[in-house]
C-alpha cells in the first residue's frame, strides 16, 4: 500500500514539459527533499517527458503523456508513459550519445542523465505501442 499517489496527463506539446517538472516537484516536496534532490527529480522527469514528445510522438502535438507518481515511505516512483512509436532497441537507445532524431541538435536521449540523478531506471517499450520509463529515488526522511 502506498503512502500517496498522483497522476496527470497532458498533450505532447513541448510547453508542457515545464508543467510536468513543477507538478512532480510539488508532489515530491512532501518528502522534504534538499534543493539538489528536487533538482535531480525535475531533471530526470524533464528528460523522460522530452523523450516522449520528441522521440515518441515525433513532435506531434496530438499525443498524450501520462505521469504516475507514488510515494512509499522514503521512496518516490515515477512512471512517464506515452503511446508513441516506441523504441526499437532499448539497449542502443540507452547509449550516451544515441538519438533517434540525428536531425535535431541534441546529444542523446537522456537515459544516462536519468541514471545519474535517480537511484533506479527501467525502460519498457514496444515498437508501435509506446514507452514506459520508471524512475525511482530514495530520500533521507527525518521523522
From Swiss-Prot:
Alphabetical UniProt keywords: ATP-binding, Kinase, Nucleotide-binding, Serine/threonine-protein kinase, Sporulation, Transferase
Does the keyword section mention Zinc?
Answer: no
Pfam families, sorted: HATPase_c_2
Which branch of life, at top level? Answer: Bacteria
Q: Which reaction does it catalyse?
A: L-seryl-[protein] + ATP = O-phospho-L-seryl-[protein] + ADP + H(+); L-threonyl-[protein] + ATP = O-phospho-L-threonyl-[protein] + ADP + H(+)
GO BP, sorted A to Z: asexual sporulation; negative regulation of sporulation resulting in formation of a cellular spore; sporulation resulting in formation of a cellular spore
Instruction: Spell out the protein name for this chain.
Output: Anti-sigma F factor
Q: Whose protein is this, by species?
A: Clostridium beijerinckii (strain ATCC 51743 / NCIMB 8052) (Clostridium acetobutylicum)
Q: Which gene encodes it?
A: spoIIAB
Amino acid at each position: 500500500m502506498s503512502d500517496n499517489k498522483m497522476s496527470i496527463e497532458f498533450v505532447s506539446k513541448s510547453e508542457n514539459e515545464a508543467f510536468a517538472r513543477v507538478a512532480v516537484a510539488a508532489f515530491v516536496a512532501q518528502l522534504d527533499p534538499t534543493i539538489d534532490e528536487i533538482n535531480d527529480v525535475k531533471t530526470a522527469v524533464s528528460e523522460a517527458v522530452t523523450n516522449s514528445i520528441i522521440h515518441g510522438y515525433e513532435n506531434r502535438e496530438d499525443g498524450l503523456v501520462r505521469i504516475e507518481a507514488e510515494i512509499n515511505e522514503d521512496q518516490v516512483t515515477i512512471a512517464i508513459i506515452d503511446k508513441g512509436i516506441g523504441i526499437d532497441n532499448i539497449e542502443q537507445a540507452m547509449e550516451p550519445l544515441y538519438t533517434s532524431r540525428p536531425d535535431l541538435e541534441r546529444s542523446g536521449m537522456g537515459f544516462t542523465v536519468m541514471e545519474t540523478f535517480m537511484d533506479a531506471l527501467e525502460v519498457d517499450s514496444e515498437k508501435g505501442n509506446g514507452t514506459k520509463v520508471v524512475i525511482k529515488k530514495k530520500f533521507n526522511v527525518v521523522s
